[in-house]
């Protein structure tokens, strides 16, 4: 009788546990959304995750110039930077801000995390830290290091996973579920630095198009019931990449978006940010008059620098221009 009572108690506890079990799912269509979520403007569609080439444009310059001189362009020089918006730059197909990527039970609140790391298993995309720039890792181009900053936490990406707990202000919730939209995930500050070390690299030609498919950083979502729940803060991405790629919603990459040009360069060391030219009547200009304002620019060039705006695979051509941001003046000049 005692045995039967304990058995019954055990079976009852199983039912209680099953009834309170919570879990998250990846949302790929509207069938996972409640009427309340749909009425609130939330949507859903299939998404493929952080595949190597499924990345967007971070907003970096299309051409990044690298000097072969360690004195003209010393270690730590910022070569380029951009802010990657998760909605538009983390995947090849942009997300809408209200596109739901995951659905969790309301009991999961407090257990939901954004996880982020560098590509810790790729030698040229986030595996090896360089001591020359804090938080930066060797990149595919020789003498270049990349540093990524999570703009929600202010922390640098690392090959060792970091986490950010999601809170109710970043999701939609009804009486049964929590819906995690794309807007819940963080943007990134992406920086590229010149370094002296040549320890890890794949490219070193006078001109290299970045065709390295490996992303430099990843964002994953961790919640109960998902395989990504096994990712813990502090684990090494080199061996712990549970749920990649289909359960990771985004990645940061420069694949097919930048070209590295190496050679003798020039740099501007002194210049005014804005030059204001006094207004002048159209009639005066038509009669041959003009309006002037003096300004000074200091330009320093390396030996061998080539002055040209033409593309080249044999030299890092340099050119300087001036931007006129007054639309009327620009239109008149083009007539």
What are these regions (language model features)?
Residues 289-295:
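Short, solvent-exposed loop/turn segments enriched in Ser/Thr/Gly
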Residues 9-16:
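Hydrophobic helical h-region of N-terminal Sec-dependent signal peptides
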Residues 301-307:
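Outer-membrane beta-barrel proteins
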Residues 1-8:
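Bacterial N-terminal signal peptides that target proteins for export
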Residues 17-22:
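N-terminal signal peptide c-region/cleavage motif recognized by signal peptidases
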Residues 23-267:
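N-terminal export/ancillary region detector
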Residues 260-284:
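Surface-exposed beta-loop interaction hotspot
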């Amino acid at each position: 009788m005692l045995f039967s009572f304990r058995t019954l108690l055990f079976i009852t506890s199983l039912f209680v546990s099953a009834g309170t079990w919570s879990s998250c799912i990846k949302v790929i269509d509207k069938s996972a959304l409640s009427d309340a979520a749909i009425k609130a403007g939330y949507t859903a569609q299939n998404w493929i995750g952080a595949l190597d080439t499924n990345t967007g444009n971070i907003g970096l310059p299309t051409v990044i110039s690298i000097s072969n001189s360690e004195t003209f362009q010393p270690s730590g020089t910022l070569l380029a930077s951009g802010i990657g918006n998760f909605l538009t730059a983390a995947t090849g197909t942009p997300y809408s801000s209200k596109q739901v990527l995951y659905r969790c039970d309301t009991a999961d609140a407090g257990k939901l995390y954004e996880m982020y790391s560098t590509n810790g298993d790729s030698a040229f995309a986030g595996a090896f830290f360089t001591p020359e720039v804090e938080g930066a890792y060797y990149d595919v181009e020789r003498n270049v290091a990349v540093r990524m900053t999570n703009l929600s936490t202010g922390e640098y990406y690392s090959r060792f996973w970091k986490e950010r707990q999601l809170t109710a202000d970043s999701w939609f919730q009804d009486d049964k579920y929590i819906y995690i939209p794309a807007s819940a995930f963080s943007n990134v500050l992406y920086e590229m630095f010149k370094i002296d070390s040549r320890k890890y690299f794949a490219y070193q030609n006078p001109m290299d198009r970045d065709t390295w498919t490996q992303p430099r950083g990843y964002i994953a979502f961790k919640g109960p019931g998902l395989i990504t729940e096994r990712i813990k803060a502090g684990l090494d991405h080199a061996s712990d990449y549970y749920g990649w790629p289909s359960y990771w919603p985004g990645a940061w990459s420069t694949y097919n978006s930048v070209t590295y040009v190496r050679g003798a360069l020039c740099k501007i060391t002194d210049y005014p940010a804005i030059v204001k030219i006094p207004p002048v009547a159209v009639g005066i200009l038509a009669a041959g008059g003009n309006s002037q304002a003096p300004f000074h620019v200091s330009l320093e060039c390396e030996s061998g620098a080539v002055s040209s705006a033409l593309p080249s695979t044999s030299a890092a051509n340099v050119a300087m221009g001036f931007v006129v941001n007054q639309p009327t003046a620009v239109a008149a000049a083009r007539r």
